[in-house]
Regions:
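Basic- and aromatic-lined ligand-binding clefts that recognize polyanionic substrates
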Residues: 62-143, 147-156
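Extracytoplasmic ligand-binding site segments that recognize negatively charged/polar headgroups
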Residues: 20, 34-52, 85-107, 127, ...
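Acidic/His-rich segments in extracytoplasmic proteins that coordinate ligands and/or metal ions
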Residues: 1-56, 188, 244
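Short helices/loops that flank or line small-molecule/ion binding pockets
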Residues: 2-8, 166-175
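Structural recognition of the beta-strand scaffold that forms the well-ordered cores
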Residues: 11-15, 32-33, 86-89, 178-182, ...
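Stable alpha-helical elements in mature extracytoplasmic
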Residues: 17-21, 46-49, 62-66, 73, ...
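Structured C-terminal subdomain patch of bacterial secreted/periplasmic proteins
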Residues: 44-48, 55, 64, 177-247
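Second-shell loop/turn segments in exported
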Residues: 9-12, 35-40, 51-61, 94-95, ...
């Protein structure tokens, strides 16, 4: 906090990971809280966040052009996703955790339109999405970054933070057209961790149509997907990752 005070900012922008520091930061300068709302959707949250910032700095036209570009790119990806099933998950500590459409990587099922089979199997244990205000309103204590991993090996439970650990037998039984994999250990720089490809390409996963058809997708920039989604630059990178595989 001392370093922030020394900068003497006129305004402070924070995301969900700093929501617990809202009060302390607000004593230094007005705080604008910018996070994502899973009920609204990642893309609309990004657009709203960008418009909030643009309104402060008079950059509305630039943001309008960027959001229009995102819409066109998403429409193209939706055509690729139409009629295809998928599982979306992250590898961490040698296991594979399924993600629903309620948190990280939710753009794949919600906006791009893949039929995320994990979304059908998870139990939404939270009543609503993560908080987003795009204003000086204090965020709720319950954000997507505050919740821990739940699950019993079947991929069931709230998936908003780290997903739910699923056995590889569960993945085989679901047999999706695509499997999207985000490497959490790479995203956070875990030393000595298994790479996502080493975890996923085992004898069981090799039985899936996704493996046989070359449709296991390893998201190229896991650090962005895991820690940075919610901004214009991050969304641009995420769409590029999907475009590189699907087009």
């Amino acid at each position: 906090m001392e370093a922030v005070m020394e900068c003497e900012p006129d305004i402070i922008f924070i995301g969900g990971r700093l929501s617990a520091s809202y009060d302390a930061l607000n004593e230094i300068a007005p705080v604008v809280y910018l996070a994502t709302d899973t009920q609204k959707g990642l893309v609309e949250s990004v657009n709203d966040n960008a418009r909030t910032i643009a309104s402060i700095f008079g950059l509305e036209k630039e943001v309008d052009g960027k959001t229009a570009d995102f819409a066109a790119r998403i429409e193209t990806l939706q055509k690729k996703a139409e009629g295809n099933t998928a599982l979306v998950g992250m590898t961490t500590s040698g296991s594979f955790n399924l993600m629903g459409n309620d948190g990280r990587c939710s753009i794949i099922g919600n906006e791009i339109g893949f039929d995320n089979l994990a979304a059908d199997s998870v139990t939404e244990s939270r009543g609503g999405g993560s908080e987003h205000s795009g204003s000086e309103e204090k965020p709720s204590k319950e954000t997507s970054d505050d919740l821990g991993k739940e699950g019993n090996g079947s991929g069931q439970g709230s998936t908003s933070t780290h997903g739910n650990e699923a056995s590889f037998e569960t993945v085989v039984s679901m047999d999706p057209d695509y499997i999207f994999v985000m490497d959490r250990d790479s995203a956070i720089g875990t030393e000595g961790a298994q790479l996502a490809r080493e975890i996923m390409e085992n004898e069981l996963i090799m039985k899936t149509d996704a493996y046989k058809n070359g449709k296991i997708v390893y998201l190229e920039h896991p650090a962005v997907w895991y820690t940075a989604e919610g901004g214009i630059t991050a969304l641009d990178v995420m769409l590029s990752d999907l475009e590189g595989i699907l087009q």
